[in-house]
Amino acid sequence: MIAFTDIVGMDLAKQALMLLAVDPSLGGVVIPSTVGSGKSTLARAFADILPEGTPFVELPLNVTEDRLIGGVDLEATLASGQRVVQHGVLSKAHKGVLYVDSLSLLDSSAVSHIMDAMSRGAVIVEREGLSEVHPADFMLVGTYDPSDGEVRMGLLDRIGIIVPFTPVNDYRARKQIVSLVMGTRNEEDTQDELRMLRGIIGAAREQLHHVSITNEQIKGLIQTAISLGVEGNRVDIFAIRAAIANAALNQRTEVDDEDLKLAMKLVLVPRATRMPEREPNPEEMAQDEPPPQEEQPQDEAEDQNAPPDEADSDADEEQEETPDMIEELMMDAVETELPDNILNISLASKKKAKSGSRGEALNNKRGRFVRSQPGEIKSGKVALIPTLISAAPWQASRKAEQAKKGIKSTAALIIGKDDIKIKRFRDKSGTLFIFMVDASGSMALNRMRQAKGAVASLLQNAYVHRDQVSLISFRGKQAQVLLPPSQSVDRAKRELDVLPTGGGTPLASALLTGWETAKQARAKGITQIMFVMITDGRGNIPLGAAYDPNATKASKEELEKEVEALALSIQADGIASIVVDTQMNYLSRGEAPKLAQKLGGRYFYLPNAKAEQIVEAALS
């Protein structure tokens, strides 16, 4: 295994891990990067620089709830005749490190338990008559590939440092990596370097409580967080602690500008939702000033000083009339009144579910243990207490029967096949909302601002319920997946904010892309899926246009047949739908309502719609 000091490059990530070693109250370090970048090797090597005896526990992705938080050790309990408690992975990481590779793929139930443990510093085990509290105060180190999906925001909120980095591409560095792996390392030199580094970190831990930071520096970090659009006071505290930890690592008693810059780089910038605009310097302003002009007649001067929108309106109209020109229109989302429960209403129309339990389903493998039922050992996890209770009344008769047969049994209990009880769990199977936003030229003429606002409000509703979202835009010749299924609502909003518009309306491509995304999600265990289509419903680009330049033209009947065939297939597949119509009344020919009918979904008219009107329409 490669040691921490032998790893080439990745300086920022190594520095982040060293800060965590100095101040465990930073919560943890998350390292997102592509496959083969060395992130997992670095994370595992983190154990080298921790104090001797510090637990370093790796969490498998397929961990069960019993192994994660602990419970009754069935084998030991049956052998001893007394209940034996088994500690889970989280409590084994107490005062140490919990490492998770492919963090974004970790089961949502496991993520919830980790979040709870990080908040409490302990794990509460309550199951099968057992109620215990196990200490679980640990640092979390996670690595993942962003292409696999995003890490749950609630978990990232509890982790101080996020360090994205790219694979080493410098020739000399890559040659050094190859030589290191293929050659012979001097183990003695490596151990000397590790001892030295552990000594530096130990000294920094002692120095940590002697480092001071001024009110002005704290104010600067907070103002930076605000300007970057970073929300939450917890992040401010993480940034302050990171700056202090770096000062301690460098054996300083006061935080300086370098410490503040590093804290911003590791804590604030990765969480930024916007980037502040740089103010032009005096030289740039001087260069931008127009040269002095000769005096002109007043009327002519007034014409030249007219607002750009008015002065260039004729030119703009001429450009809009050019058919070969695709105009990019960037618009900001604005508030739109849509009911908070619009998603719940439409889900209820497909599948009746109790409030607060959206997407929950019973299974034999994972989730919260709710009850037991008769079954075979191979079909699930044995419910120990119910099994023992079922077997207890028959012990005397079973032992007597064995005695008649001349069988001597030393077993404390004789458990029959009919006594076995299997655990039943309730787990959130997950709800995926696939937002399909029409970004064609016709949308730009209608209500793109309101459409973006509508999606933003629906995204917020999905965030509250911890659902997954996917964002698909369709314009030009085909649809494009801007965001694969993810719990990162913030990322979806960022993609939405910069969504360009223009070109044709490949409605059939949008339906096909959404359907393929839904199929992939189902293969990963997501059972409830909903389409949210923001469109005027006026498709004019056939499916083949993305592959065949000659297929851009099709008759209205052919286009309608494509859309109808896909819509009916999607409805037959049990996917719920909402169609939000953005068309103006005087232009509408009823395309969006027809689309909603073919999908078997709910229809809402966006312009001028009020929340109560949409709710009434959904319930009617």
From Swiss-Prot:
Protein keywords: ATP-binding, Bacteriochlorophyll biosynthesis, Chlorophyll biosynthesis, Ligase, Nucleotide-binding, Photosynthesis
Pathway of action: Porphyrin-containing compound metabolism; bacteriochlorophyll biosynthesis
Protein origin, superkingdom: Bacteria
One Gene Ontology term of the molecular function aspect: ATP hydrolysis activity
InterPro entries listed in its UniProt record: AAA+_ATPase, BchD/ChlD_VWA, ChlI/MoxR_AAA_lid, Mg_chelatase_ATPase-dsu, Mg_chelatse_chII-like_cat_dom, P-loop_NTPase, VWF_A, vWFA_dom_sf
Binding site residues for ATP: S33, T34, V35, G36, S37, G38, K39, S40
PANTHER family linked to this entry: MAGNESIUM-CHELATASE SUBUNIT CHLD, CHLOROPLASTIC
Protein name: Magnesium-chelatase 67 kDa subunit
Species this chain originates from: Chlorobaculum tepidum (strain ATCC 49652 / DSM 12025 / NBRC 103806 / TLS) (Chlorobium tepidum)
